[in-house]
């Protein structure tokens, strides 16, 4: 009898909703993240936040700063700091390419979302982004309102 294949879908754990509003996304890249077991359990329960988090590059390593992971309530062995720096896993060539773009153009690395892949590993989608000015944010809001208005008109007919 054939063995049933177990298929896991990509489950989106957490998302940084403000990132697309406050930044102009130029390029995205997916990276692995180095976590401890209790942190993975917390993320699976949805007790994590990417708000106000960003990535930095130090000594050819990428670090995710200010990612909030609430400590797992059943872990009594070690108390971890909720906003500690976490290492992101990328190839050296990718890190050097990102470093050069950040240095020459004044761009920022921000996380857009974190999700579990088909193997159950947590991945972080990073974006190479440029901060929006206030008038750019207003244009985004106007465009969204116009789109909503058009949708309402289409529903009426």
Swiss-Prot record:
PANTHER family referenced in this protein's UniProt entry, alphabetically:
SSRA-BINDING PROTEIN (PTHR30308:SF2), TMRNA-BINDING COMPONENT OF TRANS-TRANSLATION TAGGING COMPLEX (PTHR30308)
Q: What is the lineage of its organism?
A: Bacteria, Pseudomonadati, Chlorobiota, Chlorobiia, Chlorobiales
- Briefly state the protein's biological role: Required for rescue of stalled ribosomes mediated by trans-translation. Binds to transfer-messenger RNA (tmRNA), required for stable association of tmRNA with ribosomes. tmRNA and SmpB together mimic tRNA shape, replacing the anticodon stem-loop with SmpB. tmRNA is encoded by the ssrA gene; the 2 termini fold to resemble tRNA(Ala) and it encodes a 'tag peptide', a short internal open reading frame. During trans-translation Ala-aminoacylated tmRNA acts like a tRNA, entering the A-site of stalled ribosomes, displacing the stalled mRNA.
Q: Which organism is it from?
A: Chlorobium luteolum (strain DSM 273 / BCRC 81028 / 2530) (Pelodictyon luteolum)
* Molecular-function annotations in GO: RNA binding
Q: Which domain of life is it from?
A: Bacteria
Q: Which HAMAP family does this chain map to?
A: SmpB
State the encoding gene: smpB
The family assignment reads: Belongs to the SmpB family.
Write out the annotated subcellular location. Answer: Cytoplasm
Family annotation (Pfam families) = SmpB
* Protein's name according to its UniProt entry: SsrA-binding protein
Q: Which UniProt keywords apply?
A: Cytoplasm, RNA-binding
Does the record carry Cytoplasm as a key word?
Answer: yes
